[in-house]
C-alpha cells in the first residue's frame, strides 16, 4: 500500500511555508484545496505544484456535502478542476461522483480520475451498489470512505473491497472505514486489496487517521519476510 498525506493550507502564506522535506516519507501528496477560499485556489496552485515538483500529487476539492470545507456549484467545481488539470497536470484528480454526477461527462477525457464517495455519517447498506457503479465507470481509482460505528461495518467494507478487487484485478481501489473502530481498515489495505492508506503528519484530514510515522512502522512490520 502507498501512504498518502494531505496538505491543507488555508492561505498562500501557509502554502509557501510548507516544508516539502517533511513529507518525504509519504508516497503521494494530496492537496486538499477545499481549505482555501474558492477564489484563492488558482492563486495558490503554483506554490503547491512548485513545492512538490517531482512528487505524485492528488488534487482534491472535498465539498461540504462529503465532509469537506467548501461549497461549489457544478460549474465552479468543473471549472477549478479543469484549470488545475490543464496547467499543472496532477497525477490524480479526485471527483465526487455522487455529488456531481450530472457533469461527470465533462470529465471523460481525463484518464487519471479518482472517483470518490464519502459518507461521514454511516456505512450505507448499499455499499455493494456504490462500489459496483463506480467500478463500471473504469476510473484510474475507486475511492470510498465511510463512517464505521460497529465492528461489522468495518468487516463488511473490507469484505466488499476484497471481493471487488478479486473480480476486477486491474481496477485500483481505496476503501476506508473512518472513525476509531475503523482504524484497522487503514493498516490492512494490502489484505483487502486497497492501494492507498491515508496518514497524517500534523492535522488529520479524516476521523481515525494514523500518523505517518506509525503507518511507516506498521508497513515495515507487515512487509517483513
From Swiss-Prot:
Which reaction(s) does its UniProt entry say it catalyses?
Answer: 3-dehydroquinate = 3-dehydroshikimate + H2O
The UniProt record gives the binding positions of 3-dehydroquinate as 6, 30-32, 62, 186, 205, 209
Q: Which pathway, per its entry?
A: Metabolic intermediate biosynthesis; chorismate biosynthesis; chorismate from D-erythrose 4-phosphate and phosphoenolpyruvate: step 3/7
**GO BP terms in the entry:** 3,4-dihydroxybenzoate biosynthetic process; amino acid biosynthetic process; aromatic amino acid family biosynthetic process; chorismate biosynthetic process
Homology family: Belongs to the type-I 3-dehydroquinase family.
Subunit composition?
A: Homodimer.
Protein name, please? 3-dehydroquinate dehydratase
Amino acid at each position: 500500500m502507498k501512504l498518502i498525506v494531505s496538505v491543507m493550507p488555508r492561505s498562500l502564506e501557509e502554502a509557501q511555508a510548507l516544508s516539502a522535506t517533511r513529507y518525504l516519507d509519504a508516497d503521494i501528496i494530496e492537496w486538499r484545496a477545499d481549505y482555501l477560499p474558492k477564489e484563492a485556489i488558482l492563486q495558490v496552485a503554483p506554490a503547491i505544484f512548485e513545492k512538490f515538483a517531482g512528487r505524485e500529487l492528488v488534487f482534491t476539492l472535498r465539498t461540504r456535502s462529503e465532509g469537506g470545507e467548501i461549497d461549489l456549484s457544478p460549474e465552479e467545481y468543473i471549472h477549478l478542476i479543469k484549470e488545475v488539470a490543464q496547467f499543472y497536470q496532477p497525477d490524480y484528480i479526485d471527483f465526487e461522483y455522487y455529488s456531481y454526477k450530472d457533469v461527470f461527462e465533462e470529465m471523460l477525457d481525463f484518464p487519471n480520475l479518482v472517483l470518490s464517495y464519502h459518507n461521514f455519517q454511516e456505512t450505507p447498506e448499499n455499499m455493494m451498489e456504490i462500489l459496483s457503479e463506480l467500478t463500471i465507470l473504469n476510473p484510474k481509482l475507486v475511492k470510498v470512505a465511510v463512517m464505521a460505528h460497529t465492528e461489522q461495518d468495518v468487516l463488511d467494507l473490507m469484505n466488499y473491497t476484497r471481493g471487488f478487487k478479486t473480480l476486477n484485478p486491474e481496477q485500483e481501489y481505496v476503501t476506508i472505514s473512518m472513525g476509531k473502530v475503523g482504524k484497522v481498515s487503514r493498516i490492512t489495505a494490502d489484505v483487502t486489496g486497497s492501494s492507498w492508506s491515508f496518514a497524517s503528519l500534523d492535522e488529520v484530514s479524516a476521523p481515525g487517521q494514523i500518523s505517518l510515522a506509525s503507518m511507516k512502522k506498521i508497513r515495515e512490520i507487515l512487509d517483513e519476510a
